[in-house]
């Protein structure tokens, strides 16, 4: 206990260095040289190497298999041309248009566009007539080439869901243009659509009586080899038990060579937290092993963590607690804890620590959800929390999620909350597990 008191008396001095070093990590991981940590230009591989280098520099130990765990999966990538013009105006990728994460590529000039009204969209007969009308040449013959444009931003609720579903069906036959009036939220997909599917900002285009689209889009489906990055700090005395911290490092990558998604808050910030936690525990080992796992493939569907739980490097039953972190670059409005309702005692401990130290304004409770890498561990019986911050930064899965847009306002407090929780939850579990 005396050592714990000394340790956390030292913590405030340690924290300032932590946040400054975290800024360095995030700026690096968000830089164009990392290509959005995705599937173009080996972005995720560059990030994996960087994280492993940081674990080594900190002095962490590797597992018997090394610092990496490899696995494969199919993914849609956009490595080359990404050009779209509507009525002669060239649109800016990432801000004025995005392609659907599973969009097929293609190249065509001056393809006629049928602008579908909402009335036509929700009436199959009128929609069919509209397509037939626009799809005729001057001699009354069908041209068999046409793109469909829908403005979905005027629709809400169930009607919007119905319309979105319709677009998914129509893209099997036609290129589809969806006009939106809110920020883009991009993603990653593993399967291609039959035709190009393009989202365009309402403010970026002007429509007339006759409308045309020109596009050149390179889209490929490839089998991708990714790597989880793993390290640990051994316990002070030999132990089979683990406290585990995790964060995914992959993001969305590039959409062509001009636009990339930096992924500052999601989740370069979580990776920075992971690296700095490794530094802290290397200098302050505990009675249990402390493992650090940076997962790949989270944005594709939690693939890295799923693979790890099916092929564990150490027995999952030896994990006393797992803490998954994401969106660590803000926190002005507090944090939310997924799985809080599954593990009420641990959640109560976390709240007590936060209240006693006045770390963040709120520690919110949320039930189980398959929304990050904690999920498959929980499914295997591992006690786990997933913590993400809340704050004014609304950039998520867009090109504005940059290093410059992060406040790091609560990074120090989040670090303190995590380390104090880690010390107490592992100490209590260790004492319960000791033989008398």
Residue ranges of model-derived segments:
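N-terminal capping segment at the start of a domain
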Residues: 19-42, 46, 58, 62-63, ...
